[in-house]
Amino acid sequence: MGTSYGGYATLVGLTRHPELYACGVDIVGPSNLETLLRTIPPYWEAIRADLYRAIGNIDTAAGLAQARERSPLFSATNIRKSLLIAQGVNDPRVKQAESDQMVAALRAGGIPVTYVLFPDEGHGLVRPENAIACNALIEEFLARHLGGTAEPISAEEMAASTAKIVEN
């Protein structure tokens, strides 16, 4: 379970070592390093060189191959366990398309995925109502897949959030 890089790390773990996981939770984590780098906002331009050093220069064949090899999207069919993905629609850093393409790949492979969108959030959850709803959904998801318990969220609390569970 993780947010941003932690979400990416969760996806990497699930794709490279699926036997070690009972389930996973990815919150605003990138799934495709190529599209992540191609959508760098203008105010991040100053750190592009650092990102290319860490991920690979996608303007070169070798760098693009490296970025793709490190991208969970291209190994999504290796995932064997259920995944919950939460994404802010207005995320300027990890665009919704990162999660959309991962969800599509998982569903195409018959892998169970719960996809929760927050239309009024960005890179993380700021509104307390959304954080409460997301945490409750995660708690219920983990209880179901790990065999624990979860405190149910009330209908009023869920309705106060903007969480949208995206079905097939």
Predicted ranges, named:
Residues 1-168:
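Active-site-proximal cap/loop segments of hydrolase catalytic domains
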